[in-house]
């Protein structure tokens, strides 16, 4: 089976989680081709249509799998090949983009949503109709969709909540244990040597779930949490306060007494894995999310997690000791959860939870193949 992946192209590659999903599909014996979109905005995407049509004729694909709503809209402007579109959150949560995503939803042969909250936003009245007499309000006014459908990650696509829509978060690669990963080489250093050159054993490190220049991730809230934590839970001066930290000159680090916040930017995938294995916690303060990959990746590394209640984080981390979801955006409340996570002082059972939910890339690729075969 030939699958043509259509997604935004960044320097000749797709987003890492798309690349990893493609590799998992190839491991199942599928021929996976790519069409990278370099245009920006709706007009930039529409200008890609002639080239995309040529690629479709050339590749003779059985299925087109588009990632994000604008890519789905573009892919559906041809009607020769069935299109599966995955909506990742930003294409649902941003109203100006949602209107284009809704057109893609109507045209696509099958839609994949990565979180239940996105389902309610995207499908609106249809979602509530499908809830039927199980619909009930929650404290924040959103629909309770725990019983939205008999579909689970262990079900077949035909059990999805409609024949055209499936709830399926993206998967993650399950890394080898740190005892095996640490011997891999990064340039002139092993990962173990690299991480010890970056992290001081005397300091507790908190990995921020994004870049400091990404306003959607709300880095200012995260920095406020660090300030509150240090003023509330420690009166000790940081060991590095009067000497230079190994990464003190980096814009990617905020140092404040006993804990330091590290920006997740500019690292390779192996380096991110090393940080997740060695940092004391992951902190997420995003304003909106779908099914954030960084949370699932941290879980796979056993990293404790503190997050505001966003996307599907609460559902993913449910039952994972050392992980805390805060129902408010108050820095003091998040700082208290961070105190608990740091006091946990160990690795979580997140890896086992990821596998139990069927969220390894291998498991998700199997579900995708079932969807593809349902359409051809």
Report residues per predicted region.
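Conserved donor-binding/catalytic core segment of Leloir-type glycosyltransferases
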Residues: 160, 168-172, 184-217, 223-230
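A charged, aromatic-enriched C-terminal amphipathic alpha-helix characteristic of glycosyltransferases
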Residues: 181, 329, 343-374
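Conserved acidic donor-binding segment of nucleotide-sugar-dependent glycosyltransferases
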Residues: 319-331, 339-345
């Amino acid at each position: 089976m030939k699958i043509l992946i259509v997604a935004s192209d960044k320097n000749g590659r797709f987003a890492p989680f798309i690349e990893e999903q493609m590799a998992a599909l190839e491991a199942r014996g599928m021929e996976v081709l790519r069409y990278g979109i370099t245009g920006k905005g709706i007009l930039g995407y529409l200008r890609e249509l002639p080239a995309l049509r040529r690629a479709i004729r050339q590749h003779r694909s059985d299925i087109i799998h588009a990632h994000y709503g604008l890519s789905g809209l573009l892919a559906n402007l041809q009607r020769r090949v069935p299109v599966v579109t995955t909506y990742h959150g930003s294409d649902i949560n941003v109203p100006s983009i949602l209107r284009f995503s809704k057109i893609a939803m109507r045209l696509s042969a099958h839609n994949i949503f990565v979180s239940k909250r996105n389902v309610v936003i995207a499908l609106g009245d249809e979602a509530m109709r499908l809830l039927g007499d199980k619909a009930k309000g929650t404290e924040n006014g959103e629909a309770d969709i725990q019983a939205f459908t008999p579909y689970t990650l262990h079900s077949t696509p035909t059990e999805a909540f409609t024949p055209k829509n499936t709830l399926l978060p993206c998967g993650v690669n399950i890394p080898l244990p740190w005892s095996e990963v640490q011997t891999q080489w990064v340039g002139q250093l092993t990962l173990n040597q690299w991480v010890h050159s970056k992290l001081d054993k005397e300091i507790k490190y908190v990995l921020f779930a994004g870049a400091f220049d990404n306003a959607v991730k709300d880095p200012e809230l995260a920095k406020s949490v660090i300030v509150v934590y240090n003023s509330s839970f420690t009166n000790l001066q940081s060991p590095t306060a009067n000497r230079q930290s190994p990464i003190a000159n980096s814009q990617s680090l905020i140092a404040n007494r006993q804990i330091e916040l590290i920006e997740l930017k500019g690292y390779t995938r192996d380096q991110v894995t090393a940080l997740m294995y060695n940092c004391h916690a992951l902190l997420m303060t995003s304003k909106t999310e779908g099914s954030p990959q960084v949370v699932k990746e941290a879980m796979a590394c056993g990293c404790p997690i503190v997050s505001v209640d966003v996307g599907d984080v609460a559902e993913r981390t449910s039952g994972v000791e050392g992980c805390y979801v805060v129902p408010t955006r108050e820095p003091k409340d998040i700082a208290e959860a961070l105190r608990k996570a740091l006091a946990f002082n160990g690795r979580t059972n997140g890896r086992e939870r990821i596998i139990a939910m069927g969220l390894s890339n291998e498991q998700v690729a199997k579900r995708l193949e079932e969807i593809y075969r349902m359409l051809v």
